[in-house]
Amino acid sequence: MSSSSQAMLQKSDSIAEKMPDALKQSRYHMKRCFASFVGGGKKLMKREHLMNEIEKCIEDSRERSKILEGLFGYILTCTQEAAVVPPFVALAARPNPGFWEYVKVNSGDLTVDEITATDYLKLKESVFDESWSKDENALEIDFGAIDFTSPRLSLSSSIGKGADYISKFISSKLGGKSDKLEPLLNYLLRLNHHGENLMINDDLNTVAKLQKSLMLAVIVVSTYSKHTPYETFAQRLKEMGFEKGWGDTAERVKETMIILSEVLEAPDNGKLDLLFSRLPTVFNVVIFSVHGYFGQQDVLGLPDTGGQVVYILDQVRALEEELLIRINQQGLGFKPQILVVTRLIPEARGTKCDQELEAIEGTKHSHILRVPFVTNKGVLRQWVSRFDIYPYLERFTQDATSKILQRLDCKPDLIIGNYTDGNLVASLMATKLGVTQGTIAHALEKTKYEDSDAKWKELDPKYHFSCQFTADLIAMNVTDFIITSTYQEIAGSKDRPGQYESHTAFTMPGLCRVVSGIDVFDPKFNIAAPGADQSVYFPYTEKDKRFTKFHPSIQELLYNEKDNAEHMGYLADREKPIIFSMARLDTVKNITGLVEWYGKDKRLREMANLVVVAGFFDMSKSNDREEKAEIKKMHDLIEKYKLKGKFRWIAAQTDRYRNSELYRCIADTKGVFVQPALYEAFGLTVIEAMNCGLPTFATNQGGPAEIIVDGVSGFHIDPNNGDESVTKIGDFFSKCRSDGLYWDNISKGGLKRIYECYTWKIYAEKLLKMGSLYGFWRQVNEDQKKAKKRYIEMLYNLQFKQLTKKVTIPEDKPLPLRLASLRNLLPKKTTNLGAGSKQKEVTETEKTKQKSKDGQEQHDVKVGEREVREGLLAADASERVKKVLESSEEKQKLEKMKIAYGQQHSQGASPVRNLFWSVVVCLYICYILKQRFFGANSAQEY
């Protein structure tokens, strides 16, 4: 589109005003196009579908280009989707991040009407459920209608800078007459720890008294040398109405008092930020991460368990470290406490997820607190998918709240939720206790599945999106602040809406119409990017810290010329620098795209080797269809471009200590890291590589575009333009050859960018500032939020709780039904061959044996035995299985086999013989079950 057309539109108040002019520019072709749009009847069309139809309708390429480069073409590029309900085509246009407009075009006469979000959603609903779209009593959710008193940002560029603007709003609110300072005074009077006043006491109950006492106190403190401990003059300050919390030394106390005095005299956001960073407001933090297996060892790769565990553990370490520094600077001897609250899972798969309390490594006062899911039948033992978790959350919140209060011996000062379930639990608890709350979505499921809102009925039996999207809306609107890693997460990019932005207006036909779900211009949104653990990911130049013990294995990993299960391909010229990439092997991560770019470019092949860490080599080892396709594509590319001797493919690596040293070894070769993803929400590997001093090329689609300053701290590449990207990488190596300092300059530029913006220390400082600042903002707006609070309570009780009743609560599978019969057939001298999980044996037989031989050691369950158990003793047949195995006839036969097996074992039978008897027992059980459940003929065939 021409720049003049874009400028013309930007001057207009709305797309609706310019749309008629755009259609008039080529009325004949426009009528043909819109007739084609409505030709197939009702449907939902995406931008690419509209473009395809235009290409079919306007055969003349010159005429088509003229239209697409004009005003209509620009409007089309702004359009995210179109609801087609003949004769109308309704467009949902997004000219800028966060800004949405809706227009309706009559395909017959090309008349244009501007419509509301509600009108657009009704047209969209009629594609999926026409009767519901016409229901005048259909439920509409409109948070905008009850949240109109809250200030809003106005520019797309302001999105995600909420705390900065909250400071400005507060300073504006406090400015003027002294009575406007009362909220700040009341906030200071409420500061306490375990009932002990901090900063000021009730003697300073007016602004005038506080201001006067501050002036006198500054004079008193000035008489002491700057390093004088607070305790030396604490009593003198107490007599003036001041309590501890101002600082640990005379210098610190004086600084804090002067800052407060200046805020009381003339509030400005800079001074307010400084004041709130010093106030003793946060000591005890609760972090919820409910689903999956949350632990410190042996959990990654288990269901619903991934990078979020590492994120939260690193977050906790950084928070505790920052809290300890602040508490010490405040002159307080308190010990901070951080609790990561998750689910206790009795069937823990060899992890510590069945352990209630676990100290977090690398911290002094932080723990994982696990609370079980409880139903009316008791504690739920097995893992539950994150999609099926909703019926348990209310009871979990109640039980967790009780445990937390008992553990902390007070209310927490800050509650942080993670993911939909953790955010909802955090919202329920924060509302009940009146505590400041923050939420972190990590990934909102709504944007992962196309049209998952409109097609929720199809997906609900499997994913329960009706529960999830409702829970997300509740948590987003309850929370005091929202933390995201990137701008893209909130408001996307020019072409793509953000994850939160997709909740602005959407519909779930037959359930509810959300005309205003969340406003991305709300100042509750904040960007606080995580860092990488700098004790693990540090520059390659720090020789004394490097993990040299990994060097032999890394040399083997990179240069051993023999293919094996861990690597294939080889590097003939070890003197060349290495182009390195590490990611999952899927389409979006685009690793095969990078290999193809490299294969096509002769210049780059001559200048550098290529090494990728991704997935498997053998398709049979993967259960993922997409990964299998990428594996095949990778092998094809290796053959097509004859990459042997230039390319090394390493299987996925999970040891982050060795991975960090691998980055540094690549830096030793003067290589680069390339992240070529088609889209990347954040880009943790980019942060890791830059931390290690490795010059980085990363996708311009998503978070990495924010991390890297192009040409200064790294380089942006376009994943959709391989030729341009590979040229950029090649030019870098050429410049490094001609300028010996260029590689070092980019390496140092990357490190500078990391230290300025992407460390866990910066993250912790931002988070604690938010906890203090939004805590005050929450108190100031308490009365205005009452209506919204009631609205949310109604949505939770009348909508969400009803939806959770449709989620099937699985039958608990206690050990007597699942394990007892099978395990009684096994000898007592069982060894653990699996993940190390221990299960309690609770059959009546075992209880009797335990009474006679008190303290008998519980038996570990082998992985193989667990698989047999899962295959044979399925939950829906467990009772019948039990009856079969306990029938007198079969029991006698099995007892004989068991005795024979035991005799063989006691006589020191060989492993082969032991294996033989194990197989016999298992096959006989299969035979019994087959005969009883599927008939004699089926059993004979078996």
Curated annotation (Swiss-Prot):
Residues 830-862 are annotated as: Disordered. Its main location: secreted. Detected in the whole plant but more precisely confined to the vasculature in cotyledons, leaves, petals, anthers and roots. One of its GO terms (cellular component) is extracellular region. It comes from the Eukaryota. One of its GO terms (biological process) is callose deposition in phloem sieve plate. Keywords: Cell wall, Glycosyltransferase, Secreted, Transferase. InterPro entries: Glyco_trans_1 (IPR001296), Sucrose_synth_GT-B1 (IPR000368), Sucrose_synthase_pln/cyn (IPR012820), SUS_EPBD (IPR056736), SUS_N (IPR056735). Gene3D superfamilies: 1.20.120.1230, 3.10.450.330, Glycogen Phosphorylase B. It catalyses: an NDP-alpha-D-glucose + D-fructose = a ribonucleoside 5'-diphosphate + sucrose + H(+). Optimum pH is 6.0-7.0 for degradative reaction. Optimum pH is 7.0 for synthetic reaction. Optimum pH is 9.0-9.5 for synthetic reaction. Disruption phenotype: No visible phenotype. Residues 838-862 have a biased composition (Basic and acidic residues). One of its GO terms (molecular function) is sucrose synthase activity. Its EC number is 2.4.1.13. It is found in: Secreted, Cell wall. Residues 281-759 are annotated as: GT-B glycosyltransferase. Sucrose-cleaving enzyme that provides UDP-glucose and fructose for various metabolic pathways. Functions in callose synthesis at the site of phloem sieve elements. Belongs to the glycosyltransferase 1 family. Plant sucrose synthase subfamily. PANTHER family: PTHR45839, SUCROSE SYNTHASE 6. This is Sucrose synthase 6. It comes from Arabidopsis thaliana.
